Every structure is written in C-alpha cells, then in structure tokens.
C-alpha cells in the first residue's frame, strides 16, 4: 500500500553523509536523499555547487513524527553555533540551515531555534540560517547513503545522549495568556 500522506523537510548541518545516516534511522522517516540547495548554481554537483549547502531531504510520515521532533533531533546531532563549519569541514557548504517549505515550517523552525537558545544546551548563539526552500539538486549516487556503504567512513555527527530540549509553549500561546 502506497503512502499518500507524507511531508518533507530539508536541512543542512555540515557534511550530508552524517546527517543522512542519523536521520534515516529516526521513527517516521520514510526516505532521505542528499543534495545541494540554498545557492544560485543550477544543476549543482559536488565539484560545482557554488554557494549551495550540502543538505538532506527527509520524507516523513506525520502520523508517526512531526517537523518539530525532526528539528529537535537536528539540533541534537550538529553544532548550530558554528558559522559555516561542522567538525573539520569549513565553508558555506557546511553551514547550519533549515530550508522551510511553507509558513508553518518557518514558524516551527523559528520557535525551535528560540527554544534551543533559551535552553542553554549549546554554549553560544544559534547561527542556523532559516530560508525558503529553493531548488534541491540531488547529489551524485556515490554520496547517497554513503555511511551505509562505508560504515567506517568520515562523519562529524553524533547523537548527544544528554541533549534534551525542554518543551515550552509556542510564542503565540504566550501572547494569548
């Protein structure tokens, strides 16, 4: 039976190999693919992606998980306080970014960032870019599911076991109180 009710998230947080590898195991995630987005270069490739970020496109089942849960996991597995860098990887390709698809995703992204900053779980200011999703250029086959094919391959992403974002009321709920 084909799934008809799915949603999409597009996130960038350093080298796409590690982000994809961790997200593909999350409950409710149906599929992932890596690629390039957030820059101006058409038909982006690994060798020519200009100002694009390495990103992962996540297709998920909203009956099992939601966008906020995916974003909380995103902030748990990468450092959102380092501009244009994750681990040894440096440059705009490795920036922290959330590429929203609609106004609701933008609202959830901004609220989640506010919660991350209020939590003090990270030592600095969150520098994650929040931008409207643009064209997503799928990366070459050798980059798809890279760490499944090469389990000991390079990654700078990991789940921080004690990192748990406290739930807080959304900004709109506070204004109505």
Swiss-Prot record:
InterPro entries: Met_Sox_Rdtase_MsrA_dom, Met_Sox_Rdtase_MsrA_sf. Its EC number is 1.8.4.11. Signal peptide: none annotated. It catalyses: L-methionyl-[protein] + [thioredoxin]-disulfide + H2O = L-methionyl-(S)-S-oxide-[protein] + [thioredoxin]-dithiol; [thioredoxin]-disulfide + L-methionine + H2O = L-methionine (S)-S-oxide + [thioredoxin]-dithiol. Keywords: Oxidoreductase. Belongs to the MsrA Met sulfoxide reductase family. This is Peptide methionine sulfoxide reductase MsrA. It comes from Mycobacterium leprae (strain TN).
């Amino acid at each position: 039976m084909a799934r008809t009710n799915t949603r999409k998230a597009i996130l960038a947080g350093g080298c796409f190999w590690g982000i994809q590898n961790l997200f593909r195991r999350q409950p409710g995630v149906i599929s992932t693919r890596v690629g390039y987005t957030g820059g101006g270069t058409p038909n982006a490739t690994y060798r020519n992606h200009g100002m694009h970020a390495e990103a992962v496109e996540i297709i998920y089942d909203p009956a099992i998980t939601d966008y906020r849960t995916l974003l909380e996991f995103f902030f748990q597995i990468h450092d959102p306080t380092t501009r244009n860098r994750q681990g040894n990887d440096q440059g705009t390709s490795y920036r922290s970014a959330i590429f929203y698809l609609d106004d609701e995703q933008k609202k959830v992204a901004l609220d989640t960032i506010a919660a991350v900053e209020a939590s003090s779980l990270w030592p600095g200011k969150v520098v994650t870019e929040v931008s409207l999703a643009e064209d997503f250029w799928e990366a070459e086959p050798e980059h798809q599911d890279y760490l499944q094919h090469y389990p000991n391959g390079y990654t700078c992403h990991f789940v921080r076991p004690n990192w748990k974002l406290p739930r807080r009321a959304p900004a709109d709920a506070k204004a109505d109180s």
